[in-house]
Amino acid sequence: MRSEFWQNILDRAGKSEDGKQLPFFSLAPMEAVTDVVFRHVVSSAAEPEVFYTEFTNASSFASPKGIHSTRGRLTFTPDESEKLIAQIWGSRQADIEFMSQELPKLGFQAIDLNFGCPDKAVVKSGGGSGMIRTPALAEEIITAAKTSGLPVSVKTRLGYSRPEEFHEWLKFLLGQDVEVLTVHLRTKKEMSKVPAHFELIDEIVKMRDEVAPNTLLQINGDIKNHQQGMELWRAHSGVDGIMIGRGIFEDPFCFEKFDIEHSRQDYMNLLNQHLDLFDKHNTEASPRKFEPLKRFFKIYVRNFKGASDLRARLMLTKNTSEVRQILTEFGENYEDMMENYARISEEYHKNKNSEEV
């Protein structure tokens, strides 16, 4: 029986004109990226049906010393509760059980277990894609998470070293009665260095249909936007969800259902919103470091003349006030700058043509 949380997700995804269930879209959980601030920025640009928190270590959460450092990762606002999933990881059954049972008290309605992170430190500790090599432990971790009473899902990879490992590994996971199985279509060894194995989607769908027809299947890897996701869904019947990860860095509007051209000001508005939200959530109780904010500048400051110079200036800032000042100056001088670009370009082409003659 499907949980109310996931049924609501499917209902929000809607039906096609012929009555077929449309896929739900989600933003992949990403370290130091998918926090409460960025999730709200993405929502305002084009909202997917599902969000995930940054992945949070259960052992740190269970530790008296680490509990405060992990709480910030789990911060969310009331309007997110119907679409936000807490993604957790770890290799200690007791810690997973403790954290899973605490999550409902924090207001979470669903849990996702990270069995796919390829980070060396995570894998060495037995977590992330290290679980692929220890299925017995993976089963214990899933069982521990289920003690929360919340719907439990798993995000993983095809295998550890070889794509063919999916035959055993994914079949094993499908036998664990998880609500959703998200498959990053690469192995741990492949990282993101090779193209995602879209050619295996149909085999995975068939396996799901045979082993666990009630488990929702979500695919991830090399999917840049909503349009590409829909193309994959149409080409591979049986896929229930589409997860976009790095595509968000190329286009913050990637969840838009139609290809819309956005102006420079549209991107600047998102950046200003990000700054406002950063300041709003930067409190004494939950202080935020400014330096990590700089990694987001390239998402918004791109694909227009002067973007490279503007980014270079922004990277030298020390606080949001300095960023706002530079953005204001840039906006006020933009028209003059464009005239200079046009003049320089015209002179360049004149000189080039005269040389050719």
Protein language model features and the residues they cover:
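Alpha/beta catalytic cores of nucleotide-metabolism and tRNA/nucleoside-modifying enzymes
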Residues: M1-Q21, F25-S26, E31, V37, ...
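Glycine-rich, positively charged N-terminal anion/phosphate-binding segment
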Residues: R2-S16, M30-E102
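Hydrophobic faces of well-ordered beta-strands that scaffold small-molecule active sites
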Residues: F25-A28, F51-T53, L84-I88, I111-L113, ...
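Active-site beta-loop-alpha junctions enriched in small/polar residues
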Residues: M30-A32, T56-A58, W89-S91, G116-P118, ...
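An active-site metal/cofactor-coordinating segment within enzyme catalytic domains
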Residues: G66-I67, T77, K120-S129
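Alpha/beta enzyme core
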Residues: E97-I111, F115-S125, A136-L217
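Short glycine-enriched, charge-decorated loop/helix-capping segments at active-site entrances
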Residues: G126-I132, E190-M191, D259-E261
